[in-house]
């Protein structure tokens, strides 16, 4: 087992850790960190009705400043493994690329973070900081790709109960769009899902006057909701976006007018809203568009994905400088994309996301250039050098 990012990433990929299975992935990291002097804890979290999940927390040092690296070792299913040109869990290296599920999202990023920390410690007498007074920690979960209830959110609670305090965190999600160094995520839009219901009156299609068809009504409401923007965006965020994802009536009969129609939707919202104000806005628009013609209601799904922003400042400047030093490009500070575990971390310390290029994540033949693994390791090492300077 090597200490370089490629060796660590290959060992991780060879563990088929599709959520909720760990499949030995955390066991790859534990001895590497222990041998470097980290105090390592393996914690299993439980929740009724869902699978138990293994997590790992490791820390070296006891003082401040304290920087954490966060990530996950679980992966999405590989899909049709026969469609892969290399085994989905082979960790094969071909023509300068490392293949396998998780190569990009995000076993490669975890491997680079660990390799950078080990390299930094080897060069500084095994202690973080110029005088050994700082701390480096790792927050690694196996529950990010699924419902994320037994992962980072509970690992942070567990750490806080122990008295752990973090000053800053780097989350190694694949933040870059086209090339390594093009983007640092400094925030994320919130996410809220719901289902719009329109009640009609079921009846025979030959006697429409005895029924009330909810389909034209829900179609009109969908048009009304998507035709007017929720907002125009803000200085750090793009406009909020409402997307309908399904429309259903549950009616297999061609001669029956359905009694109810429903449409499911998701909203990615910016810092003009919180969940309460967003729900009120959508409900008001539905009420205004429907009038007294039909009965409507919205059932909102629980959400733990609030909008957040890590304000640009010394920490974002430090990370951007480390990125530019390695890649030669100054990264954009972005809040685009979907949700991540940063939504939990932001309640404990400022957090940014910087990792690999996400072009092939969740795809058949997911792969990462070996050169990018080497560069990302150097970026993370540069972050540590600057952080403890």
Curated annotation (Swiss-Prot):
Question: What EC number(s) has UniProt assigned to this enzyme?
Answer: 3.5.1.18
Gene Ontology MF terms in the entry: acetylornithine deacetylase activity; cobalt ion binding; succinyl-diaminopimelate desuccinylase activity; zinc ion binding
Highest taxon of source: Bacteria
Q: Which residues bind Zn(2+) 1?
A: 72, 105, 173
Reaction(s) the record says it catalyses: N-succinyl-(2S,6S)-2,6-diaminopimelate + H2O = (2S,6S)-2,6-diaminopimelate + succinate
Q: Where, in this chain's numbering, is Zn(2+) 2 bound?
A: 105, 145, 362
Query: What Pfam families does UniProt report for this protein, alphabetically?
Result: M20_dimer (PF07687), Peptidase_M20 (PF01546)
Per its UniProt record, the required cofactor names are:
Zn(2+); Co(2+)
Enumerate the PROSITE patterns for this protein: ARGE_DAPE_CPG2_1
Q: InterPro entries, from UniProt? A: ArgE/DapE_CS, Bact_exopeptidase_dim_dom, DapE_proteobac, Peptidase_M20, Peptidase_M20_dimer, Peptidase_M20A
TM segments?
A: none
Signal peptide coordinates: none
State the UniProt keywords alphabetically: Amino-acid biosynthesis, Cobalt, Diaminopimelate biosynthesis, Hydrolase, Lysine biosynthesis, Metal-binding, Zinc
Q: Which GO terms describe its biological process?
A: diaminopimelate biosynthetic process; L-arginine biosynthetic process; lysine biosynthetic process via diaminopimelate
**SUPFAM superfamilies to which the protein is assigned, alphabetical:** Bacterial exopeptidase dimerisation domain (SSF55031), Zn-dependent exopeptidases (SSF53187)
Assembly notes: Homodimer.
Q: Which family does it belong to?
A: Belongs to the peptidase M20A family. DapE subfamily.
What's the name of the protein?
Succinyl-diaminopimelate desuccinylase
């Amino acid at each position: 087992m090597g200490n370089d990012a490629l060796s660590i990433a290959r060992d991780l990929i060879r563990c088929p850790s599709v959520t909720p299975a760990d499949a030995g992935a955390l066991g790859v990291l534990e001895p590497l960190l222990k041998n470097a002097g980290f105090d390592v804890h393996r914690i299993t979290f439980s929740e009724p009705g869902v699978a138990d999940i293994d997590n790992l927390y490791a820390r070296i040092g006891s003082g401040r400043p304290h920087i954490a690296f966060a990530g996950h070792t679980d992966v999405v299913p590989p899909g049709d493994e026969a469609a892969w040109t290399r085994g989905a869990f082979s960790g094969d290296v071909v023509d300068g690329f490392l293949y396998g599920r998780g190569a990009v999202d995000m076993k490669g990023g975890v491997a680079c973070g660990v390799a950078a920390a080990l390299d930094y410690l080897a060069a500084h007498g095994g202690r973080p900081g110029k005088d050994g007074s700082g701390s480096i920690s790792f927050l690694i979960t196996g529950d990010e790709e699924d419902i994320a209830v037994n992962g980072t959110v509970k690992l942070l609670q567990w750490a806080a109960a122990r008295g752990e305090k973090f000053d800053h965190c780097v989350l190694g999600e694949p933040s870059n769009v086209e090339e390594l160094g093009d983007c640092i995520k400094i925030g994320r839009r919130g996410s809220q899902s719901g289902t719009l219901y329109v009640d009609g009156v079921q009846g025979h299609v030959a006697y429409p006057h005895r029924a009330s068809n909810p389909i034209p009504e829900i179609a009109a409401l969908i048009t009304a909701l998507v035709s007017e923007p929720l907002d125009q965006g803000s200085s750090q965020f793009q406009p909020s976006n409402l997307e309908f994802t399904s429309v259903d009536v549950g009616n297999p009969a061609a001669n029956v007018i359905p009694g109810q129609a429903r449409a499911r939707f998701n909203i990615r919202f910016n810092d003009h809203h919180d969940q309460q104000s967003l729900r009120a806005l959508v409900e008001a628009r539905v009420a205004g568009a429907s009038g007294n013609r039909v009965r409507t209601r919205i059932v909102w799904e629980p959400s733990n994905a609030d909008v957040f922003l890590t304000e640009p400042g010394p920490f974002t400047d430090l990370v951007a400088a480390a990125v530019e030093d390695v890649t030669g490009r100054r990264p954009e500070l972005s809040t685009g994309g979907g949700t991540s575990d940063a939504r939990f971390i932001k309640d404990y310390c400022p957090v940014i996301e910087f990792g690999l290029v996400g072009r092939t994540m969740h795809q058949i033949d997911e792969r990462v250039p070996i050169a990018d693994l080497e560069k990302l390791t150097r970026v993370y090492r540069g972050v540590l050098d600057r952080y403890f300077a």
